[in-house]
Amino acid sequence: MKITAIKDLVRKDVPIYYRRLFSGTLVIEMVNSTVESRIDFTVETSPMGQNEIIINSMEQVDYPLLPLNKEVKKFISLLDETGGLPG
C-alpha cells in the first residue's frame, strides 16, 4: 500500500487561525489496483509550533485502518512541510 496523491485538495475557511481544514480525494495504490477515497482532515498548530494532523472522516477502504491512518498522516505531514497544501 502506497499513498500517491491527494487530488482536488481544497482548504475550507475556519475562523480559528491555528486550525486549517482540508478536503480532497486520497489516491491509494494497492498491490493490484488503485483506490480513491474522500478525506477530510485538519492540521492544527499547537502553541509550541508543532503541527497535529487529525483525520476527521475518510471513506471506507479495504485495508487495515491503523496502518492506513499512519501513512496518511505521514503523507499529509510531508505535503505540509514541502508547501503542497493550499494556502
Indicate where each model-derived feature is located.
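Short beta-strand segments that buttress and anchor functional surface loops
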Residues: 24-29
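A short, amphipathic edge element
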Residues: 1-10
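Compositionally biased, intrinsically disordered low-complexity regions enriched in proline and serine
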Residues: 18-19, 23, 64
